[in-house]
């Protein structure tokens, strides 16, 4: 059950408890609850709707019990710093953090480091769409790119594209087939770090080139699990059955769950 989120002045923080039937991590007892944090907001996207679509999708497709905390920064300002990130314990207690945000014009090394440190220390992450375009100014911008596993300088025109699976045997993609988005913004990838593994790609109508748009990354000295996708500009794309399954699989993988065993059976 997704709780409707009421209007607040600036920052919205709400915990949503949902039920299913698996364990949060392999080390936890059956029936335990995974704690997930979704951070969203910023420029250029419908984060008001997506803050509900993402948890709903994962809850619909996963057996896992998840307690969601949603932090929504209600601003279109791409240079707005969240006080939340300035607390060194901001990620404490969460099993996985989902970043669906768009704050491109922030370059403060101290601020960026405050976001990266918990992930470098081992907190798993799911990165969606414009998160790959965040924090791309300033002297330490490449540290963010290393976390993402790629550098994306921009995107092409909006158009549907076929998602072509490049790693069908990977746990996340196993059993999935290629699909075509109803609409989309294909991000260009001009650098892939050696820590990332491509899972799927699509062809740009503008350049004719293939660009990775689903991948995993082993971040930092602890090889923290990071699942990332640049797909997800439009709500109708996020609401596709294939997208919802894909984001659930990536979430479960990042959290250290056996993906196939943790998915609900597909409805026939």
Q: What is the meaning of each model-derived region?
A:
Residues 59, 65-67, 93, 156-226:
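Catalytic beta-strand/loop cores that center a nucleophilic Ser/Cys/Thr
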């Amino acid at each position: 059950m997704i709780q409707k989120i009421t209007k607040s002045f600036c920052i919205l923080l709400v915990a949503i408890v949902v039920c299913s039937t698996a364990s949060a991590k392999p080390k936890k007892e059956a029936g335990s609850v995974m704690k997930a944090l979704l951070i969203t907001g910023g420029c250029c996207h419908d984060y008001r709707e997506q803050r509900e679509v993402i948890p709903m999708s994962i809850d619909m497709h996963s057996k896992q019990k998840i307690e969601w905390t949603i932090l929504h920064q209600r601003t279109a300002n791409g240079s707005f710093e969240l006080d939340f990130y300035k607390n060194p314990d901001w990620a404490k207690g969460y099993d996985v953090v989902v970043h669906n945000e768009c704050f491109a014009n922030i370059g403060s090394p101290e601020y960026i480091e405050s976001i990266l440190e918990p992930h470098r220390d081992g907190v798993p992450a799911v990165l969606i769409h414009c998160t790959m375009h965040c924090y791309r100014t300033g002297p330490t911008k490449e540290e963010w790119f290393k976390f993402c596993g790629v550098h994306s300088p921009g995107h092409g025109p909006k158009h549907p594209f076929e998602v072509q699976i490049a790693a069908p045997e990977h746990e996340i993609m196993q059993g999935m087939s290629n699909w075509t988005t109803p609409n989309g913004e294909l991000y260009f990838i001009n650098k892939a770090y050696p820590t990332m593994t491509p899972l799927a790609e699509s062809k740009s109508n503008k350049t004719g080139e293939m660009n990775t748009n689903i991948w995993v990354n082993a971040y930092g000295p602890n090889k923290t699990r990071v699942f990332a996708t640049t797909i997800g500009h439009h709500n109708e794309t996020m609401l596709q059955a294939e997208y919802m399954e894909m984001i659930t699989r990536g979430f479960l993988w990042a959290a250290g769950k056996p993906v196939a065993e943790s998915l609900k059976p597909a409805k026939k």
